[in-house]
Structures are given as structure tokens and as C-alpha cells.
């Protein structure tokens, strides 16, 4: 592997959550919704976890179909599975 493709495990991401954007979207879509101070962070974390699960599941689908590239079909199939699991 080339040196530029190796990412250090100890390096932490310093980017912050887009709190202003999330609050603006909440107010625009649901003006009657009242959230506590860290409610937007919980929504952001939930979105990140969903995207992470979606990436893992779609990668599994791509490997199962012996494809090196994750296609649209892999992502859609993974989304169906994840949304079924999250319904409870």
C-alpha cells in the first residue's frame, strides 16, 4: 500500500456536528417540535449510525454477489433490511 493511503488509527476527527443546520431544518419542517439542548446531537448521531450500518450491510451484499463495487441495488437491498430491523 502506498504511504498516502494509510490512515493513522490514533488520528481523531475534529469536525463538529452541523448544529445550526439541524436546528434550522427542525424549525422549518416541524415548528411545533420542542427539543432539549442536545436533541439535535442525538439526531445527528442516529443519522451517522444509520449510514454506518447501511455501508456495512451494502458491503456485505456486494461481497455476497462477488462484486467489488457497491451498486445502487446493494444499497437499496441493505436499506430494506436495516429499516425492517429498526422498526422493532
Curated annotation (Swiss-Prot):
Protein name (record): Centromere protein W
Subunit structure comment from the entry: Heterodimer with CENPT; this dimer coassembles with CENPS-CENPX heterodimers at centromeres to form the tetrameric CENP-T-W-S-X complex, which is a subcomplex of the large constitutive centromere-associated network (CCAN, also known as the interphase centromere complex or ICEN). Interacts with NPM1.
Role, per record: Component of the CENPA-NAC (nucleosome-associated) complex, a complex that plays a central role in assembly of kinetochore proteins, mitotic progression and chromosome segregation. The CENPA-NAC complex recruits the CENPA-CAD (nucleosome distal) complex and may be involved in incorporation of newly synthesized CENPA into centromeres. Part of a nucleosome-associated complex that binds specifically to histone H3-containing nucleosomes at the centromere, as opposed to nucleosomes containing CENPA.
Single Gene Ontology MF annotation: DNA binding
Localization (cell): Nucleus; Chromosome, Centromere; Chromosome, Centromere, Kinetochore; Nucleus matrix
Gene Ontology CC: chromosome, centromeric region; inner kinetochore; kinetochore; nuclear matrix; nucleolus; nucleoplasm; nucleus
Entry annotated with the keyword DNA-binding: yes
Alphabetical GO biological process terms: cell division; CENP-A containing chromatin assembly; chromosome organization; chromosome segregation; kinetochore assembly; mitotic cell cycle
InterPro entries membership: CENP-W, CENP-W/WIP1, Histone-fold
Tissue: Highly expressed in ovary, liver, lung and pancreas and to a lower extent in breast and gastrointestinal tract cancers; such as those of the colon, rectum and stomach. Overexpressed in high grade breast invasive tumors. Expressed in many cancer cell types.
Keyword presence, Cell cycle: yes
Major location (coarse): nucleus
CDD domains: HFD_CENP-W (cd13732)
Species annotation: Homo sapiens (Human)
Coiled coil: none
Keyword terms of this UniProt record: Cell cycle, Cell division, Centromere, Chromosome, DNA-binding, Kinetochore, Mitosis, Nucleus
Amino acid at each position: 500500500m502506498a504511504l498516502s493511503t494509510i490512515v493513522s488509527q490514533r488520528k481523531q476527527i475534529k469536525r463538529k456536528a452541523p448544529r445550526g443546520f439541524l436546528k434550522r431544518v427542525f424549525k422549518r419542517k416541524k415548528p411545533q417540535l420542542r427539543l432539549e439542548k442536545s436533541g439535535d446531537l442525538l439526531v445527528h448521531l442516529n443519522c451517522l449510525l444509520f449510514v454506518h450500518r447501511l455501508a456495512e450491510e451494502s458491503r456485505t451484499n456486494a461481497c455476497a454477489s462477488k462484486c467489488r463495487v457497491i451498486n445502487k441495488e446493494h444499497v437499496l437491498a441493505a436499506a430494506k433490511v436495516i429499516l425492517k430491523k429498526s422498526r422493532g
